[in-house]
């Protein structure tokens, strides 16, 4: 994991490869592939994200497109709204706000591995813009709820938040521009 952390820090998410990680760790690339199906899983392990990104995206994108925003939020809260998840959110946000390399890694990961995949699956126009809008909403939620602890948002039950947040995410991801 130290070699992977070093590669992500030096090259960002986009510039890091599984072969580069293997080289830095002085192991055969097949060993890395044995434990991780892709770069997204290595990054999730390095950042201690308690879920597999591909599984999250599959769960979010399966089902009726009209429920996309709600499924995104339910998935988000199931991963992050636990004591362990909150600690990891705070660590992620800290890395984003304290260094450009941390910000670049998180930005590239969120846009490429989560939100761009969601937008691509639903086949909408301007998928990159939509992905970044959805990511901005979710990063803002993470910051306000877990880091700043803005009340009553910080202590609200997720079920009370979903009806307010889901329509905005739905419009960002799948709604009309008009």
Locate each region found by the language model:
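Amphipathic alpha-helical segments used for helix-helix packing
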Residues: 80-103, 107-108
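Helix-turn-helix
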Residues: 3-41, 45
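Short alpha-helical scaffolding segments that buttress acidic/His motifs in well-ordered protein cores
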Residues: 76, 89-96, 134-138, 142
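Hydrophobic alpha-helical connector segments
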Residues: 55-89
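Hydrophobic/aromatic-rich alpha-helical bundle segments in the mid-to-C-terminal region
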Residues: 103-108, 118-172, 176-178
């Amino acid at each position: 994991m130290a070699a992977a952390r070093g590669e992500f820090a030096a090259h960002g998410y986009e510039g890091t490869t599984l072969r580069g990680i293997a080289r830095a760790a002085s192991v055969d690339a097949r060993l890395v592939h044995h434990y991780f199906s892709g770069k997204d899983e290595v990054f999730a392990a390095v950042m201690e994200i308690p879920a597999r990104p591909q599984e999250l995206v599959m769960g979010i994108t399966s089902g009726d497109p009209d429920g996309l925003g709600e499924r995104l939020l339910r998935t988000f809260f199931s991963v992050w709204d636990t004591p362990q998840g909150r600690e990891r959110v705070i660590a992620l946000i800290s890395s984003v706000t304290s260094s450009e390399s941390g910000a670049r890694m998180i930005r590239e990961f969120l846009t490429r591995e989560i939100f761009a995949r969601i937008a691509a699956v639903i086949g909408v126009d301007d998928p990159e813009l939509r992905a970044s809008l959805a990511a901005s909403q979710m990063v803002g939620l993470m910051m306000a709820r877990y880091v700043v602890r803005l009340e009553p948002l910080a202590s609200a039950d997720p079920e009370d938040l979903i009806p307010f947040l889901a329509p905005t995410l739905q419009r960002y991801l799948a709604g009309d521009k008009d």
